[in-house]
């Protein structure tokens, strides 16, 4: 006679275990590690932290008794971002709001809690509530959204993330496809293979049709190597063959091409990029160039491109001198909703490729405008020489964006970079309806209408 076997499976056992572990932590029982964040002390259990975070598992697993430290300092994490993650480790519930989501996202990325970081990123892109009285509701949006105090967000894989948010305004749905997100910019590359010429005309009527070339070439096949918007943070694109001698001899002036000509050049560039050979690292120029197909959802922070008067009129890349600086905690404020957007040419103090032709008269003005358009400069450790660059993946850049993988040296830079992925552009032009993420970018855009009129 066979032995009967009965298996009991309790769905509430894990929650009960976490609840009891949280009670032990709150009472201070069996806590074997102390976390210090911004001079605040948090008691916890090593086994819980190591099970939730790859960062803590790397720190704690494999240590000998002599090397075992009971106090662990987290220098790159804020208290506002750490407390929700600690509560999540013991309760499996993440409580975020519009004031702490950036801190939580930065802390989760640093602590390598990528599932939490992905949830925060998706929530910020799809469920953040913005209270912008000056912005007009877009056409095609559902006006019958209901107010909710607890928002359950469904991720891409179909799982429901228990994300609670205190909602004080009507939820605003971000459309999946908008005209502004379909626009791609064809960056002008000054290479020997494509000697592009551009004039400094800023009031040309062709500026208004600068994006028409994308509609003509959007259905053309693209090489697989160019299908994803990869950036090359240090050094130029490996697929570009620069020649310093030819660039020094041939002083080029930038000339604004028409819509059809710009589309043809972009198509020719895309088709011939795959045939170019790869250069060794030693022969690269000390410039940073990024040529790719971009949208508002596929934006990276570290973008370098040629800066000239004509291009500033094409994509409104300049900023207004003397404008008020953007504060770090302005997640609710629209002025910081998308810092680093390529549409507005924000860079992180990186070197740019300056033209050596008749636009030299505008070089000083471009440099002056470029220096004021980003409130946070690239931080270099005091031990690093001013002429050296920190490693793109080294300890100088400990903060990584979970959405696009860009790394940063300061937590403030990552916090502001994450605002890009929200896709919110609250400032709209009254003349043409184009939207911007910053007020001063809208001011510069209005100057173009004044010049044309």
Swiss-Prot record:
Residues recorded with modification Phosphothreonine: 200
Q: Which residues in this protein are found as Phosphoserine?
A: 135, 159, 161, 165, 191, 194, 199
Ranges for the BTB domain? Answer: 31-98
Q: Where does it primarily localize?
A: nucleus
CDD domains documented for this protein: BTB_POZ_ZBTB44
Task: State the InterPro entries in the record.
Answer: BTB/POZ_dom (IPR000210), SKP1/BTB/POZ_sf (IPR011333), Znf_C2H2_sf (IPR036236), Znf_C2H2_type (IPR013087), ZnFinger_BTB_dom_contain (IPR050457)
* Polar residues bias (residue ranges): 352-361
User: Where's the Glycyl lysine isopeptide (Lys-Gly) (interchain with G-Cter in SUMO2) crosslink?
Assistant: 4, 290
Q: What subcellular locations does the record give?
A: Nucleus
Name the SMART domains for this protein: BTB, ZnF_C2H2
One Pfam family linked to the record: zf-C2H2
Zinc fingers, C2H2-type class? 399-421, 427-449
Where do Low complexity bias regions lie? Answer: 304-318
**Which SUPFAM superfamilies does the entry mention?**
beta-beta-alpha zinc fingers, POZ domain
An annotated GO cellular component: nucleus
Q: Where is this region: Disordered?
A: 241-265, 295-324, 336-368
Protein name per Swiss-Prot or TrEMBL:
Zinc finger and BTB domain-containing protein 44
At the highest ranks, the source species' classification is: Eukaryota, Metazoa, Chordata, Craniata, Vertebrata
